[in-house]
Design a protein with these regions (language model features):
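Short helix-adjacent coil turns
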Residues: 1-2, 81, 112-115
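Surface-exposed, polar/charged faces of alpha-helical domains
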Residues: 81-84, 88, 95, 99-103
């Protein structure tokens, strides 16, 4: 797998546009992965700050937010007990990405909408999140 090599070459490119976004995104993923690996709880305030930064930067630069930022943003807000904001994040994300399975799963977990559950089971039964949450 040459993914780390590709990532390293990308960061070495001095002409990389918006590299700060990519750097912060990978820094965030690394933080989440390492805390999960050692069983340590994450710092939810830090998570919210980083996701807020990535959300705003994405919106400003591309006028659009990537689905993964909605997903991670939702998780960060939930971890920080910002329930109203997390609900808004999922709704906004689903408007932009109505076919996003992770967003649909989180929406189902919040609402227990049976039609959404049926859709997930029928059309995405083998998706890891559908399996993990035993929908």
């Amino acid at each position: 797998n040459d993914t780390p090599e590709i990532i390293n070459k990308t960061f070495e490119d001095n002409n990389l546009k918006n590299g700060h976004i990519l750097f912060v995104f990978f820094m965030y993923q690394d933080y989440i992965s390492k805390t999960a690996a050692i069983g340590k709880p994450t710092n939810s305030k830090y998570q919210v700050q980083v996701m807020d930064f990535l959300y705003k930067e994405s919106k400003e630069i591309w006028e659009r937010v990537p689905a993964i930022i909605y997903i991670y943003g939702y998780e960060a807000l939930e971890n920080d007990n910002k329930i109203e904001e997390s609900t808004k994040m999922i709704s906004e994300g689903l408007k932009e990405y109505p076919d996003s399975v992770p967003l649909k799963v989180y929406q189902y977990l919040k609402t227990k909408d049976q039609l959404l559950k049926e859709d997930l089971i029928k059309n995405h039964a083998n998706h890891w999140m559908v399996l993990q949450y035993k929908l």
